[in-house]
Amino acid sequence: MSNNQAFMELGWRNDVGSLAVKDQGMMSERARSDEDRLINGLKWGYGYFDHDQTDNYLQIVPEIHKEVENAKEDLLVVVPDEHSETDDHHHIKDFSERSDHRFYLRNKHENPKKRRIQVLSSDDESEEFTREVPSVTRKGSKRRRRDEKMSNKMRKLQQLVPNCHKTDKVSVLDKTIEYMKNLQLQLQMMSTVGVNPYFLPATLGFGMHNHMLTAMASAHGLNPANHMMPSPLIPALNWPLPPFTNISFPHSSSQSLFLTTSSPASSPQSLHGLVPYFPSFLDFSSHAMRRL
């Protein structure tokens, strides 16, 4: 009996030992399979697998493959423009073989409020990307064209206004307003004193209107301060205009360089539709000196 018991105890111990060895073997195999799974996942992430091993890998670690696909889908291509508020001047990645196609790589979950352009078709074989133009770029191009047109108009206005040497918009507009006020004052004074405004285009300098108005008023015996009334501009047909009869053209240098008439009678019907020109300061000053 004792021998049988000893033999049974020895067999039981052997069975327990074999079970322990089997458990250790299963644990080591499980650990090796976990390590292989992790290594295979890292290899898949870095592109070490061939196309023939794709099906086997998808059966081994499907979770890692999904994470890699989601990471690829979350990446967006950001093309900065000159009007963009974001300073994306780092993390440049070249997606094509040519070096001139450079885009900025970002994750779309990082800050969704910033402007980005999503890649619509990202084939590895294609060199160019089909992308959607944002509204910010379109607005920036429209604003640029509008600013260029405004700059051209301001340059033309600066050329029309005398003694306007500054190029900024505020200075040009101030000079233009002042110049238009001076022209309005000249028209009002001419209509008040009854001077014939039919002359050639004037050679008036900017700022010489005071001398001209003083000469006009002195020639007609009027006080300029008493006749500067804020009346509206009088049309050209209400002014006494000379007829077209007996118009003589001067030939000598001592005579006036403007048209003269022999009859001071007024005939507005003969000049219907014509716009009068501003008189010259030299003509008015010489006329005033002769009258004095």
UniProtKB/Swiss-Prot annotation:
GO CC term (a single one): cytosol
Recorded GO MF terms: DNA-binding transcription factor activity; protein dimerization activity; transcription cis-regulatory region binding; transcription coregulator activity
Domain bHLH: 134-183
Residue interval(s) of motif Nuclear localization signal: 141-148
GO biological process: abscisic acid-activated signaling pathway; blue light signaling pathway; red, far-red light phototransduction; response to abscisic acid; response to far red light; response to heat; response to light intensity; response to salt
Compartment(s) where it occurs, according to its Swiss-Prot or TrEMBL record: Nucleus
Protein name: Transcription factor HFR1
Residue span of region Disordered: 114-153
Cross-referenced Pfam families: HLH
Record note on disruption phenotype: Partially blind to far-red (FR). Impaired inhibition of hypocotyl elongation and cotyledons expansion under continuous FR light conditions.
Ranges where the record places region Basic motif: 134-147
Composition-biased stretches (Basic residues): 139-153
PANTHER family tied to this protein: TRANSCRIPTION FACTOR HFR1, TRANSCRIPTION FACTOR PIF1-RELATED
Inducing factors: Twofold induction by far-red light and 14-fold suppression by red light. Up-regulated by abscisic acid (ABA), heat and salt (NaCl). Follows a free-running robust circadian rhythm, with higher levels during the light phase.
Function: Atypical bHLH transcription factor that regulates photomorphogenesis through modulation of phytochrome (e.g. PHYA) and cryptochrome signalings. Suppresses the transcriptional regulation activity of PIF4 by forming non-DNA-binding heterodimer.
